[in-house]
Swiss-Prot record:
<dbReference type="GO" id="GO:0030077">
    <property type="term" value="C:plasma membrane light-harvesting complex"/>
</dbReference>
<keyword id="KW-0460">Magnesium</keyword>
<feature type="topological domain" description="Cytoplasmic">
    <location>
        <begin position="1"/>
        <end position="15"/>
    </location>
</feature>
<dbReference type="Pfam" id="PF00556">
    <property type="entry name" value="LHC"/>
</dbReference>
<keyword id="KW-0148">Chlorophyll</keyword>
<dbReference type="GO" id="GO:0042314">
    <property type="term" value="F:bacteriochlorophyll binding"/>
</dbReference>
<comment type="function">
    <text>Antenna complexes are light-harvesting systems, which transfer the excitation energy to the reaction centers.</text>
</comment>
<feature type="transmembrane region" description="Helical">
    <location>
        <begin position="16"/>
        <end position="36"/>
    </location>
</feature>
<feature type="topological domain" description="Periplasmic">
    <location>
        <begin position="37"/>
        <end position="50"/>
    </location>
</feature>
<keyword id="KW-0437">Light-harvesting polypeptide</keyword>
<dbReference type="InterPro" id="IPR000066">
    <property type="entry name" value="Antenna_a/b"/>
</dbReference>
<feature type="binding site" description="axial binding residue">
    <location>
        <position position="31"/>
    </location>
    <ligand>
        <name>a bacteriochlorophyll</name>
    </ligand>
</feature>
<dbReference type="InterPro" id="IPR018332">
    <property type="entry name" value="Antenna_alpha"/>
</dbReference>
<feature type="transmembrane region" description="Helical">
    <location>
        <begin position="51"/>
        <end position="71"/>
    </location>
</feature>
<dbReference type="GO" id="GO:0045156">
    <property type="term" value="F:electron transporter, transferring electrons within the cyclic electron transport pathway of photosynthesis activity"/>
</dbReference>
<keyword id="KW-1133">Transmembrane helix</keyword>
<dbReference type="GO" id="GO:0019684">
    <property type="term" value="P:photosynthesis, light reaction"/>
</dbReference>
Length: 71
């Protein structure tokens, strides 16, 4: 590890959470930007055409209108 001496300046109890937090924030910003700027990424996360086809296949059949009683 070529940057091993950094822990002489920054305590690991501070540096590791800050580093992991920065990675998490970067990932959230990246994914948020992809969702906001593209139309395919949200569909990819939702299953795309497969999910739409499955939802259409599971849709309930239409119900017939009630008939007026015969007099």
């Amino acid at each position: 590890m070529n940057q091993g001496k950094v822990w002489r300046v920054v305590k690991p109890t501070v540096g590791v959470p800050v580093y992991l937090g920065a990675v998490a924030v970067t990932a959230l910003i990246l994914h948020g930007g992809l969702l906001a700027k593209t139309d395919w990424f949200g569909a990819y996360w939702n299953g795309g055409k497969k999910a739409a086809a499955a939802a259409a296949a599971v849709a309930p059949a239409p119900v017939a209108a009630p008939q007026a009683p015969a007099q």
